[in-house]
Amino acid sequence: MPTVLTTDLAKVRNIGIMAHIDAGKTTTTERILYYTGINYKIGEVHEGSATMDWMAQEQERGITITSAATTCHWNGYQINIIDTPGHVDFTVEVERSLRVLDGAVAVFDAVAGVEPQSETVWRQADRYRVPRICFVNKMDRVGAEFHRTVDMIVTRLQAVPLVVQLPWGVESDFRGVIDLVAMRGLYWSGEGKGETYDIVDIPADRLDAAREWRDRLIETLAEHDDEMMELFLEGHEPTVEQLKAAIRRATIANKVTPVLCGSAFKNKGVQPMLDAVVDYLPSPLDIGDVVGYQPGDESVLLHRKPSDDEPFTALAFKIMSDRYLGKLTYLRIYSGRLTAGASLLNATKGKRERIGRVLRMHANKQEDIESAGAGQIVAVVGLKLTTTGDTLCDPDHPIVLESMTFPTPVINVAIEPKTKADQEKLSTAIQRLAEEDPTFQVHTDEETGQTIIAGMGELHLEILVDRMKREFNVEANVGKPQVAYRETIRRKVEGVEYTHKKQTGGAGQFARVVIDLEPGGGADGDTGYQFINKITGGRIPREFIPAVDAGCQEAMQFGVLAGYPMVNVVVTLQDGAYHEVDSSELAFKIAGSMAFKEAARRADPVLLEPIMSVEVRTPEEYMGDVIGDLNSRRGTIQAMDDIAGTRVIRALVPLSEMFGYVGDLRGRTQGRASYSMEFHSYAEVPRNIAEEIIKKARGE
């Protein structure tokens, strides 16, 4: 029987679980699903059976790639969980999830502390102002240090941690947690699956530490919450209820981040973390109105309250292909109600869409529901044109919500189908995957006719090619990864003139343009392009100006040095001339394109390459080797740290020097070092290396 999703918004929590690759995020999610009564058998990631990791590759690799959305219930509250991937190649997935969440649980590894990926995700969450609580996981592991992790939350994440629990014991003696809000001990005996725990008095040998940390908790809150400040100054001891209310206010205002601890794998500390989700993270009501603008006019701002009575507004934040259902579109509903069969407007594209079925998702099972209201996250079947980041709304009350920004891909590979039969399957596969993942891009190389796919890193492309094989049965050969170089200019050139004329029998062609070209104001890799029209006195008729602009943009696709796209330039159209009969849009497009190329040649063009931010963790004895190797890859060392006896080296290294690094690093350190890497910026390629790249590109 289809159900109707709850309408008491105060009792809804939309949360994400975010973390570094091995901090134990999927295990934590699994435990949540188990204790909230959805899974009867706990799924273990290292057995490859976890519910949230439902794609075949995830189960093999033990990493979460797609954010599966799951609904569960805890103490009368409905919690919608979006599982987010922790690997840096999947930042787009994290970005997508954060855009539609109200709160998040950041999971940290008590041994490794705050790792680079955690920082990346934390910065993304800061950008979307998502309130968070922290769960310091793996307290049972050798080398676990709760307080060091809390210190790193301050130094690496610039956050204000609010310690609301202390660990009771550590490593193999980890028994449970000390609850500083209610001043009691929570003890897990280790029997069964951790479903039950005992609430006991705090042991005498831990009481002093608990009191000291509780005082710190109250002092920190007083600094960030007026009501707590008054109680503090008047010398009143706050009640548990007053403390919880103050923690909730300060957390939702993004002033503090409550810190809890436990061991998901050993089934300890997960239920109190669920209580904290309910107690401290916001409901859709706390987040308030969502703001969008009127289609076609961004200056007219529109507000929608999180209420079923408002006009319907939702954001499509994820698209997935399901073998049986076809295309599934995940929606976050901000206002109004959605019913199966409804006709909606895709305001981003200005097109009508019809909803087939509305589904509530569990990691890879689903149930049909009749309708869902504001604040809910659902999947729908039947949308044809909607892509990630589009707004769906009531056709009578159009609104466009802010979309998401996706980074441009930094790595390309050529892909060729093995047989003629694979050719058609390949284009279907590529189209489907590109619909799901905006950072996966495809184009055809004009010169070689090859299909080029581009993504955020080697792992990203490996997994996409793997999915083509598994889900679409495409056998394909994949070339070596290529770097996505860009070109730009370093100086301004003025008055570059080009006249395009062809006057041989029949209709002629004539167009003259004069342009200035100069570097834009953005960072080196910005795709920025600006076109300024300074034509006066009708020297070029108005209707031909866009053609000049289009010609310049077309010329930018193939730079003058090595045919890579040009970025970050400003074109100013200063002057020109036309012919009453022979001028046309095409003539001005050609003139614009040729003038741009000529100007670019004169404007000191340079080649840009993607620079990656690399962090290597290595035992002390290999440190010299690792640094020497990074230097030989044109790397610049930015910082060195020591964390729990492991040396951490941060460096900026060109992507072209990082191919195959994983094997080299293993060989150098006997497999004991690990690294992570993410895109940092574009920078100019040194002249000697640029010359080689240009020669190669020109086939010399």
Curated annotation (Swiss-Prot):
PROSITE patterns linked to this entry: G_TR_1, G_TR_2
SUPFAM superfamilies for the chain: EF-G C-terminal domain-like, P-loop containing nucleoside triphosphate hydrolases, Ribosomal protein S5 domain 2-like, Translation proteins
One GO cellular component, as annotated: cytoplasm
NCBIfam families assigned to the protein according to its UniProt record, in alphabetical order: EF-G, PRK12740.1-3, PRK12740.1-5, small_GTP
Pfam families assigned to the protein according to its UniProt record, in alphabetical order: EF-G_D2, EFG_C, EFG_III, EFG_IV, GTP_EFTU
SMART domains linked: EFG_C (SM00838), EFG_IV (SM00889)
Name this polypeptide is given: Elongation factor G
Taxonomic source organism: Acidothermus cellulolyticus (strain ATCC 43068 / DSM 8971 / 11B)
Biological process annotations from GO: ribosome disassembly
Record GO terms (molecular function): GTP binding; GTPase activity; translation elongation factor activity
